[in-house]
Amino acid sequence: PLYSSAASDVYKRQTVSKELAESINLQGATVLDVGCGLGGPCRMLADEYNCQVTGLDLSNEYIRTAKELSKLVKLDSKTSFIQGDATSLPFDDNTFDVIWTQHVQMNIPNKEKFYSEISRVLKSGGHFLYYEILKKGDGEVNYPMPWASTSEISFLFKETEMDNFLTKFGLIKKQSNDQTTYGIDFLNAVFAKMKEFVPPKIGLNALMGETTKQKLVNVLGHLKSGELELKSGVYKK
């Protein structure tokens, strides 16, 4: 199925998404994907788990494209997409069974407000599922990165800090999975393909610009060195 576009990008990998989805009973759940991008995971959840999924993103262009892709694969009745701010979610308290985030928090400076809002709109007994790139070491990070050209617009933090915020807002950790090796293997595969042909304009280059290769080199280097890590997991409210 066409869950994502040619930009089924470096981090929003369907394999990890499905692994995360299988960690709880998602059948028929109402789901909010915060920072949904082009909506790939939204369509996967709607199609395979019969979820009613709302995707929210700050980018109007991403929202427009996500709507078009969902209509193209006839999932527009199960998905909806709105432009909005992750630190001021336009929803009532206790609205969703599941909140889903994938590689979003790195661009959000106010982590406390971000996780406070996630807790607010999540129903009691609901689940927060995440897949994030996090700081692990204490060294400097080289830029550009896939999510930020400079350090001024990058707001990485550590897993312990994330856990502190979520615990503060009433969520209990159920599981945490290290996906770093998986990410390294995927990036190595990307570089192997780059040697074989020039990447198409509608692929990663379209999302990351002319510095795509350097961004991938930097993130791969930091994952290998242990400065950064990839983690997925589940919290319950």
Across the structure, where does each feature detected by a protein language model lie?
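Single conserved hydrophobic/aromatic residue that forms the stacking wall/gate
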Residues: 1-7, 11
